[in-house]
A protein has these predicted regions:
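Surface-exposed short loop/turn segments
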Residues: 74-124, 133-145
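Sec-exported extracytoplasmic/periplasmic mature domains
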Residues: 68-72, 91, 160
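N-terminal, post-signal-peptide region of Sec/Tat-exported proteins
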Residues: 53-79
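C-terminal motif of bacterial Sec signal peptides marking the signal peptidase cleavage site
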Residues: 12-16
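Short secondary-structure boundary motifs at beta->alpha junctions and helix caps
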Residues: 47-53, 119-161
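A structural "domain/chain start" motif
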Residues: 17-61
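Bacterial N-terminal signal peptides that target proteins for export
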Residues: 1-8
């Protein structure tokens, strides 16, 4: 049962790892959705093992930008607000190909508010964990072909899509 659950979670994560490839396409219909506030904070962001450093400002601005890039395309009459907390990250360092190839990851907590109802849509924050986009040097890890900033952008875009 544990293997089945782990397999299903991996399929969900792989599906979310397409980054910004679809931003030129028409947005997926979300009804009357409009993102009014896109608040991102990183008060307790934890740097994972074997990770390159990133400042709180880098984390906040990159995640906020990726959310805006994806959700500012919607202009429906129903207003929603996102509250996002960056909880942790790993920005892969170059490894040893085929022996040690660290992967990048980003962990966020998301709360959504409905403006008309004046309340949260989710009582507890929804935790989102995303991995680097597969196909970007997966054998050697993203630490070789991508800078820390490029990895963070890719992770943020994956998070916005998930």
């Amino acid at each position: 049962m544990t293997r089945f659950f782990a397999g299903m979670m991996m399929l969900l994560l792989v599906g979310a790892c397409a980054g910004s490839a679809d931003l030129d396409d028409a947005p997926v219909p979300l009804g009357d959705f409009s993102l009014t506030h896109n608040v991102v904070v990183a008060p307790n962001a934890q740097r994972g093992p074997f990770s390159r450093p990133a400042t709180d400002d880098q984390l906040i601005e990159t995640v906020r930008g990726a959310i805006a890039e994806r959700f500012d395309r919607y202009d429906g009459p129903s207003r929603y607000h996102f509250g996002i907390s960056v909880e942790g990250y790993v920005l892969a360092v170059p490894g040893v190909p085929l022996v040690l190839s660290p992967k990048s990851a980003l962990i966020l907590n998301l709360t959504v508010w409905d403006d008309a109802a004046g309340k949260k849509l989710n009582d507890e924050p929804q935790q989102i964990t995303v991995l680097e986009t597969f196909g970007t040097g997966t054998i050697v890890g993203s630490g070789y072909p991508l800078s820390a900033e490029e990895q963070l952008l890719q992770l943020s875009q994956n998070a916005a899509k998930s």
